[in-house]
Amino acid sequence: MFLKNSIKSTSFKGVCSWQQLNSFYEKEQVNQMNAALYQEIQKYMQMKNWNKTELSKESGIHISEISRLFNHRQPLSLQNLDAITNSFGLSEGSLYQYYLEECFNKGKHADKRRSIQFLYKCAAEGYVNLYSDLINLMLEEQSKTIRKKNLLYIFTVAEELFQGGIGEKALPLYEVIIESESDRFSEKVAISYFRRFYIVRGTDKGQHALSFVLDQLAYMPNEIRLEAYMWIMADYYRREEWRQVLNYAEKLKKLAPEGDYYGRALMYKGLALSRVGDSLEEVLNIIDEYSIISEYYAGIAAGNRYAALLDFGKLEYVDEYLSWLENREDIYVGLPRIFETYVRLDRLNDAKTLIERFKHVIDDMAESKEPWLKEKMNLDFRYAHALFLCKSSQFEKGLDELMEVADLSNRIGNMERFKKCLLAFWKYRDYATSEHDKKYSNLLQTGKME
């Protein structure tokens, strides 16, 4: 029906051969709106008793463009579909189920522009079934060359979502690249493994995702490899695997001999050396190195000097550290170490005052969804708080918190903290209830508290 109407509206000079007619038919097929979508639009126009002029007025689409759409001389863009849907008073996405076919041309190959736009919109808005159907159709492509292009389209959308700050929406698309790309040594696959790790790094899936990233580092472009080294290093810091922190700090330093990445490599190197028993002098020298990179690193260096002094047993600097830190926005970074130092010194009243004074900072750490530094600092604080409760003779609450911190540490792969919790529990085991003993045994046997 649509083809006949289109042919009638077109004048031909001279005699039209079948070859010319077939050529015209193929051209029209490229732009022809699929029947189901066309009928849905017509249905709502009839319900509102609209003609094309009224649809143009209500949707904001120029009348000439409406005419080309209805005469199948122009494909329907997603932007125009949204405008038409809105003019009908429908919620966005109401007609998306009919748009899937518009993402493919007459040869049933994915149209680059429309498929990318539709895939992005569906992924961003959470239309899982729709984008799953689109991806499945794109992966059914028999031509290896075109299928490779389709995977590039999917990867492009994943990167746009990731760069737009909604990496969790991009995760299923990166999984598609990992599972479907035939070239296992391609940059797309390597980048997808890294993006997956970055997205899930704060969950119990992070450790598993990391193991795959380590095998893909050689296939990443330098810019992505720099980022990967940094986040791998940060993840090992979060899990307190200090030798691995040193390992990737050195790799990052070699790849980036100046600038921000260089500064971060030195910073993490200094933090790790403080934990593995290197000399205080060496750690302070490293801090001096990155203090001159920029004003930002100068501020970090000042705080890390105090932290290093405490790490090496010079606990008399704790009050000076607090005075320096208390008015800074990043107070949460040093607060757990100061609190634990007070507990170690049996300055329990000062520790209690610290909790009351900076309750808003402590609450923010606990509630933050930031999956790296604040979570790590919250874990550090909760461990110190459990020790504080035990030293304050609040054994039941203290041992409960120790078991919770041990459980969380084990789930994120922080075995160093896990062991510390179990050792602290053993120290106060005489005050444990049968429920505490049960949780302790479960953690030892299964790695889970319950």
Residue ranges and their predicted role:
Residues 1, 26-50, 378-450:
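C-terminal non-catalytic interaction modules
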Residues 29, 33, 77, 108-115, ...:
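Generic helix N-cap/helix-start motif at coil->alpha-helix transitions
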Residues 60-76, 100-104:
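Recognition helix of helix-turn-helix/homeodomain-like DNA-binding domains
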Residues 66, 102-107, 123, 137-147, ...:
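Solenoid-like repeat scaffolds
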Residues 79-95, 427-429:
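DNA major-groove recognition helix of helix-turn-helix/homeodomain DNA-binding modules
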Residues 118, 134, 157, 191, ...:
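Structural register within alpha-helical repeat arrays
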Residues 121-135, 161-175, 198-213, 237-250, ...:
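Helix-turn-helix repeat elements of alpha-solenoid scaffolds
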Residues 140-268, 272:
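Mid-protein regulatory/catalytic core that forms ligand/cofactor-binding pockets
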